[in-house]
Regions:
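Glycine-rich phosphate/pyrophosphate-binding loop at beta-loop-alpha junctions
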Residues: 21-22, 32, 87-188
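General beta-strand structural signal in soluble alpha/beta enzymes
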Residues: 10, 59-60, 82-85, 115, ...
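Short, well-ordered coil/turn elements that cap or connect secondary structure elements
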Residues: 3, 51-52, 77, 134, ...
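Helix C-cap/helix->beta junction micro-motif
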Residues: 27-29, 78, 133-135
Length: 189
């Protein structure tokens, strides 16, 4: 599409960045990928490997939230399209395909499934799919103790913005879950 010819921008502490980098390489689209300076070298190298010559990695901010804010500002200043890491219907739907893959790999419905939560996109997508396919499966979201923003939000009954997060839990260190992801997670977890 026309909008992609200018390139794309995303922010991630790892998994989303790798997926976007892979897509940039396959589709021959230039991408700017913002990651916190605390991102482990192994994740940075994976993004570089997947994106090859089609991605620029920008390390900025101590947390995902700071890198995300910088990426959004850059996308607004440029004519590039911002690809949100989790709080977007299409991203959630795409992550829901993992739920489908899970159902294809087992002979009968699972009793329990544990899903990691950062911003809640993966838990929303997989959880929504599995809730429809296996209504009796207990879906359990797992967050690090140092950045349990979804847990705090579910307990409060609304999206909560944590004051502090532990930067050590880089891949799931999100101060605030998405509004869409919170809405889905409160129904499926």
């Amino acid at each position: 599409p026309e909008v992609l010819k200018y390139g794309i921008v995303c922010a991630s502490a790892g998994n989303h960045a790798q997926g976007v980098a892979f897509s940039c390489n396959k589709l021959k689209i230039m991408g700017s990928i913002y990651m916190p300076v605390t991102t482990p070298r192994q994740k940075i190298e994976a993004v570089s490997m997947f994106g090859k010559d089609y991605v620029d990695i920008v390390l900025t901010g101590d947390t995902f939230d700071e890198a995300n804010e910088a990426a959004i500002k850059y996308a607004q200043r440029s004519v590039k399209t911002f690809i949100p890491p989790f709080d977007d219907e299409k991203i959630i739907e795409g992550q829901g395909t993992i739920g489908y893959e899970i159902t294809q790999q087992v002979d009968e419905p699972l009793d329990y499934i544990f899903i990691p939560i950062g911003g809640g996109g993966l838990a929303s997508g997989v959880g929504a799919y599995l809730r429809q396919k296996w209504p009796n499966c207990k879906i359990i979201g797992v967050e690090p103790a140092g950045a349990a923003s979804m847990k705090a939000s579910l307990e409060a009954g609304h999206v909560v913005d944590l004051e502090h997060i532990n930067k050590f839990v880089d891949g799931a260190a999100v101060k605030k879950p998405g509004k869409l992801t919170y809405g889905v997670c409160k129904e499926v977890l």
